[in-house]
Each structure stands twice: as structure tokens, then as C-alpha cells.
Regions:
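Small-residue-biased structural context
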Residues: 1-156
Length: 156
């Protein structure tokens, strides 16, 4: 996921990340149907990329986006839920990252990680992003720049 995006605000930037990781999951799914000898190695590399992208994205949300949103909106239960969802994602990511080679559970773990991610993205799009955009105390354009800067550091 590129650090610079054409999005106008923090929500647009985060959603661009969502779209990019969705594409990675789709690419992985296509590889699961491949009978090519190189498919296993490609799946492992793609899974590692997915894990990196999700780890950086979650860290950005937890360090920058969620704290700013927590100060700007009254209903913070959604933020608590989002952080719990991040922990579930991290648990699966940790399991995938310790694998030197895909085993019989590897594809299932990547698939479930994708499903968890899709659920999380849907909640952000339908609940968190509208609340963020409605919050008067939140400068989403400035927050976007903060996210871009932090992401560049994390991806370096």
C-alpha cells in the first residue's frame, strides 16, 4: 500500500489501504487454485506482504486515527471494538508469520484473516468514517498528513 494516496482526508487514505489489501487477498485466493510449483512460494510471499500491510495499517489506526477520533466523538464503543478486532487480526498474523512454509492450515488462516479484515473494513466504512467526517473537532486533512508521515516511517 503506497504511503501517498490521492485521497483528500484521513478516511480516504485509510480506505485506499483497505482497497489495496483487499486486492492482495484476491491475488492470494487466485493462487490457491493454481497448480504451479511456484504457487506455494508465491502464496507465502503474498501472505507475508498482507501481514506487513495489515500490521502497519493497524498501527496507524491505533497510534494516530483512533486517538484523534476518541477525542472528537462521544460514542467510543466502536473504537474499543475496533481495537479488539485488531488484536484478533494480530493473533492470526502472528500464527502466519512464524510459518517457514505453508502447511495444511495456512490457506484457511489467510482466508479467515481476509474475512476478519473485510468485517473490520465494513464497520469502519459504515460506522467510524461517517462519525469522523461529522466530527467538528477533527481536522481529517491534517490527520491524513500525520498518517502519511507515520506510515513512511513504519514502512522504511
Amino acid at each position: 500500500m503506497p504511503a501517498r494516496s490521492t485521497g483528500k482526508d484521513a478516511c480516504d487514505l485509510l480506505d485506499a489501504d483497505h482497497k489495496a489489501v483487499r486486492k492482495l487477498f484476491k491475488d492470494y485466493e487466485e493462487l490457491t487454485a493454481s497448480r504451479a510449483r511456484s504457487a506455494a512460494q508465491k502464496k507465502l510471499e503474498l501472505a507475508r506482504r498482507i501481514c506487513l500491510e495489515l500490521t502497519v495499517h493497524a498501527q496507524l489506526e491505533e497510534e494516530v486515527f483512533y486517538p484523534a477520533l476518541r477525542h472528537a466523538i462521544k460514542e467510543t464503543a466502536l473504537l474499543d471494538e475496533a481495537q479488539v478486532e485488531h488484536q484478533s487480526l494480530r493473533d492470526l498474523i502472528d500464527q502466519l508469520q512464524v510459518m517457514a512454509a505453508p502447511d495444511e492450515m495456512f490457506d484457511a488462516k489467510v482466508k479467515v484473516l481476509g474475512e476478519f479484515t473485510e468485517h473490520h473494513v465494513k464497520e469502519e466504512r459504515t460506522d467510524l468514517f461517517p462519525k469522523a467526517r461529522a466530527a467538528r473537532k477533527l481536522d481529517l486533512v491534517a490527520l491524513r498528513e500525520e498518517l502519511v508521515e507515520r506510515k513512511e516511517v513504519l514502512m522504511a
